[in-house]
């Protein structure tokens, strides 16, 4: 077995929830402020998932006070406490960049049955 592949297997998280573009997720992130650590929740729509192995990342978008906020998270990061799937979305694209130009009801995504 390849040495790099075996090292990646050791570092990878085992309890990852299955989700994809269009899904609404709630990401619990550990944030260090001064000397204390707390959990910050970031909820939004997954607009892309890229890479593979340890370098896999996903981008979550939400609108906060009328301003679009996008955050990219490494999937296997130790800073991510857990990922919850709130809703499964029905989309036909792997990259949902078109949501950046939509506002209000136009930016809604259908639920998967």
UniProtKB/Swiss-Prot annotation:
Q: What are its GO cellular component terms?
A: cytosolic large ribosomal subunit
Q: Which GO terms describe its biological process?
A: translation
Q: Which UniProt keywords apply?
A: Ribonucleoprotein, Ribosomal protein
Q: Which InterPro entries match?
A: Ribosomal_bL19, Ribosomal_bL19_CS, Ribosomal_bL19_sf, Translation_prot_SH3-like_sf
Pfam entry (one): Ribosomal_L19
Q: Which GO terms describe its molecular function?
A: structural constituent of ribosome
Q: Which PROSITE patterns match?
A: RIBOSOMAL_L19
- Is Ion transport among the key words of this record? no
Q: What protein family is recorded?
A: Belongs to the bacterial ribosomal protein bL19 family.
Describe its function: This protein is located at the 30S-50S ribosomal subunit interface and may play a role in the structure and function of the aminoacyl-tRNA binding site.
- The protein depicted here goes by the name Large ribosomal subunit protein bL19
What gene name is listed for this protein? rplS
């Amino acid at each position: 077995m390849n040495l790099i592949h075996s090292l990646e297997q050791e570092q990878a998280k085992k309890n990852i929830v299955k989700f994809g573009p269009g899904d609404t997720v709630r990401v619990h992130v550990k944030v260090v402020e001064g000397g204390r650590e707390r959990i910050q929740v970031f909820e939004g729509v997954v607009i892309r998932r890229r890479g593979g192995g340890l370098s896999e990342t996903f981008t979550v978008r939400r609108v906060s006070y009328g301003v679009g906020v996008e955050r990219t998270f490494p999937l296997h990061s130790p800073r991510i406490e857990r990922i919850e799937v709130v809703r499964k979305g029905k989309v036909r694209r792997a990259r949902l960049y078109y949501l950046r130009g939509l506002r209000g009801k136009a930016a809604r995504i259908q639920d998967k049955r």
